[in-house]
Amino acid sequence: MRPLTPRQSEILELIKDNLHATGMPPTRAEIAHKLGFRSANSAEEHLKALARKGVIEILPGMSRGIRLVGDDYDIADGLPLIGQVAAGEPLLAEQHVEGHYKIDESLFHPAASFLLKVNGMSMRDIGILDGDLLAVHKTEQARNGQIVVARVEDEVTVKRFEQRGKTILLHPENEDFSTITVNLAEQVFAIEGLAVGVIRNGATL
């Protein structure tokens, strides 16, 4: 990877911080506001420069269409890649691990514990697409608005988390899908982890 300018490094850190805080990248307008640019177009030019250097990928037509790109995918002891999860079984059960991949640890804050292969398009509008690899920090806690990997009864899903008393709402980011409502008094629910980034599922995987 070619060296980044101080401003490019600042933008990259902002993207990582936003992913940490909310589970999604910032918009161009948010970048411009936080870094004092005159317009979102200025932020776009810096993002294009980062894309040319192979640090991010820009997804056209999406206000938050920014993905971090991991370029170190050598098979070795590293983050486990979780594929299809059988109903009722532990997420990190050995039979679910499709491989281990080394990834630059500085890409994610907090650190990723594992990668989850995304199944479906329910989070499409924030750039999480079918077949992508979701970097997940293993935790049982989440704040409202964060993107989580959650287990509802025997099923695992990726959604935006909201809690209202004894009710959990798991919101999709695609109008073709419906919010999942969980009654904690009647249903089994657990947070498996917090989304800390998305990696494009390239041909090397």
From Swiss-Prot:
InterPro entries: LexA, LexA-like, LexA/Signal_pep-like_sf, LexA_DNA-bd_dom, LexA_repressor, Peptidase_S24_LexA, Peptidase_S24_S26A/B/C, WH-like_DNA-bd_sf
Database matches in CDD domains: S24_LexA-like
Record feature DNA-binding region, as residue ranges: 28-48
One Pfam family per UniProt: LexA_DNA_bind
Residues with site note (Cleavage): A87, G88
GO molecular function: DNA binding; serine-type endopeptidase activity
Superkingdom classification of source: Bacteria
Catalytic reaction(s) noted: Hydrolysis of Ala-|-Gly bond in repressor LexA
One biological process term in Gene Ontology: negative regulation of DNA-templated transcription
Active site: S122, K159
EC number(s) on file: 3.4.21.88
Disulfide bonds: none
Assigned keywords, A-Z: Autocatalytic cleavage, DNA damage, DNA repair, DNA replication, DNA-binding, Hydrolase, Repressor, SOS response, Transcription, Transcription regulation
Top EC class, one word: hydrolase
UniProt function note: Represses a number of genes involved in the response to DNA damage (SOS response), including recA and lexA. In the presence of single-stranded DNA, RecA interacts with LexA causing an autocatalytic cleavage which disrupts the DNA-binding part of LexA, leading to derepression of the SOS regulon and eventually DNA repair.
Self-association and partners: Homodimer.
Family: Belongs to the peptidase S24 family.
HAMAP family: LexA
Protein name: LexA repressor
Organism encoding this protein: Idiomarina loihiensis (strain ATCC BAA-735 / DSM 15497 / L2-TR)
